[in-house]
């Protein structure tokens, strides 16, 4: 996370999300990295980016496993409430238009715009709903 945060910190318009980038691998239960932050020690943006990144990872094909369906990914997110994911952030994500995001992904979004734009889209969508 520190390399990405360093790059984004050089872009004035992106500085506000740098704390979220630095913390998006933290877990609510404190077993994340790089700092082992617990619960509210993790900035809201970090919780949102972490969930969006995890959803993208779960619903993407990997060399070692096929992509999960949206339903499987949502079930995994629910299973990890209070350990990996913040309950409020996850609730808003699940209640948001996840299926629209999924449809956009399936419609060539990933190839056309790249994964980072999908994570950004999901992050913005969840961030807007939480406010």
Where do the PLM segments sit?
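Histidine- and acidic-residue-rich, metal-dependent catalytic cores
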Residues: 1-131
